[in-house]
């Protein structure tokens, strides 16, 4: 594959990392999320009743559609360092890392390409996955990515055209000069192509347990 663009938006799930089979089994989730049980457990350790903690998490999640995990830390006063440690450990234990694409990202960055994360995860979710793939440091910085466009940054997921437009508007280049690297033929291929992206690289993956797939990706 030839990577001719100077700027690339790079997907995470299915491209750089994926969930191990069973990692996101329904019985392990809280309100449809695999990390919220960690938030709840920390709240219980702080003195919350379990049921009340789960309700408080749900209410906060519903109030702000495009939330990030740091908001739960701030709202409920759970210890920041321990929360980050457990969230990071979850990713270490439950993610598959696609080393072929990780090597590609490091190579492109070494060539001076300007790389940006384009993900359906909130900002901190992106960070933890990049850390698991050795693409971000413990202080949350990344020597490979200029910006991280999570769902709370762009106010939506990649299945929405306006979300792509908001990402394009934050890159100092015209849309035809921006490339995309991902695994989803629709979200990472057809949609950005319809908006004017020309340099698109879809990395095929064998069918494996993908954790929680949104309905849009199943069509």
Feature locations, PLM:
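Active-site neighborhood of HAD-like aspartate-dependent phosphohydrolases
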Residues: 1-52
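Asp-based, Mg2+/Mn2+-dependent phosphohydrolase catalytic module
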Residues: 1-10, 102-106, 113-219
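Short histidine/acidic/glycine/proline-rich micro-motifs that form metal-
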Residues: 16, 23, 58-62, 91-92, ...
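Flexible, glycine- and charge-enriched loops at secondary-structure boundaries
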Residues: 28-32, 94, 157
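A metal-dependent, Asp-based hydrolase signature
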Residues: 34-88
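Charged, low-complexity C-terminal accessory regions
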Residues: 61, 94-96, 126
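Short, acidic loop-to-helix structural element flanking the phosphoryl-transfer center
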Residues: 67-76, 85-117, 161
């Amino acid at each position: 594959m030839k990577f001719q663009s100077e700027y690339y938006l790079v997907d995470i799930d299915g491209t750089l990392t994926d969930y191990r089979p069973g990692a996101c089994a329904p019985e392990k989730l809280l309100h449809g999320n695999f990390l919220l049980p960690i938030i709840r457990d920390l709240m219980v350790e702080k003195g919350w009743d379990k049921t009340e903690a789960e309700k408080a998490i749900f209410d906060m999640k519903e109030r702000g559609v495009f939330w990030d995990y740091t908001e739960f830390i701030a709202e409920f006063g759970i210890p920041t360092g321990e929360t980050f440690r457990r969230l990071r450990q979850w990713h270490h234990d439950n993610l598959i890392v696609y080393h072929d694409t990780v090597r590609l990202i490091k190579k492109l960055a070494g060539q001076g390409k300007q790389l940006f994360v384009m993900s359906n995860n909130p900002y901190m979710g992106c960070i933890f996955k990049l850390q698991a793939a050795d693409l971000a440091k413990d202080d949350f910085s990344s020597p490979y990515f200029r910006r991280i466009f999570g769902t709370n940054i762009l106010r939506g997921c990649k299945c929405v055209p306006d979300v792509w437009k908001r990402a394009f508007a934050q890159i100092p280049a015209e849309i035809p000069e921006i490339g995309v690297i991902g695994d989803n033929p629709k979200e990472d291929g057809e949609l950005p192509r319809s908006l004017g992206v020309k340099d698109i690289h879809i990395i095929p993956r064998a069918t494996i347990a993908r954790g929680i797939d949104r309905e849009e990706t199943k069509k």
